[in-house]
Amino acid sequence: MRKFILIFLLFKPFISNSQEDKVALDLLNSMSENYKKMKGFTSSFTYTMENLTEDIKDSFSGKISVKDDKYILFIEGQKIINDSKTVWTYLEDLNEVTISDFDPSEQDISINNVFEIYKDGYRHKFIESTEGFSIVEIYPEDENKSYFKILFKILDNNLLSSFTVYDKSNSIYIYSIDDFLEEELVSELFTFDLEKYPDIEVIDFR
């Protein structure tokens, strides 16, 4: 009898973790499907970086428009356009644009791709649900990643309220969605027309 109880106690946490993983995956899938069905969206956000070791905290605002694999990002004086093949980074103060080929493997975690990132190479864990939102964490299976955890705060309407990246240097990167607008965006919006910028300096790495 004691042996049976011991086996049961060992097996019980496994069941609990499995159920938590399923809840987490269901929440992430519902969020992802919600964004995938949109014809486009524009979001304002606040980006905060904290380093607990160095006692550093920095914060600034940004704006992003997304359609499928394309996006336009405005942040810290930069306008970054990605049409899923080419990336233009425009610095208005310098009237300078840098052009490069888009490499998905080099893409940072951001509001344009975080809805899909959990699908491959991550473990999932449900943390809790409170009034209005749920919290889910994912952990990369690749130990060479610079971060060890991403925390999602998902609203009950399957929109993302915020996500937080925890890296191995004891830094925390928080992306908080300030406002969100679902809207239809034309593909022509996601390109950089050099003719509209007289005397611009072009740095082409392609």
Language-model-derived ranges and their functions:
Residues 122, 129-198, 203-206:
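Gly/Pro-enriched, hydrophobic low-complexity segments
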Residues 19-40, 44-49, 55-57, 86-148, ...:
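Flexible, processing/modification-adjacent segments and terminal tails
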Residues 59, 68, 75, 119, ...:
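Short beta-strand-initiation
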Residues 4-12:
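Sec-dependent N-terminal signal peptides
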Residues 42-45, 59, 73-75, 165, ...:
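Extended beta-sheet lipid-handling architectures
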Residues 61-108, 173:
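An acidic-aromatic
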Residues 48-50, 67-69, 76-78, 85, ...:
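Solvent-exposed coil/turn segments that connect beta secondary-structure elements
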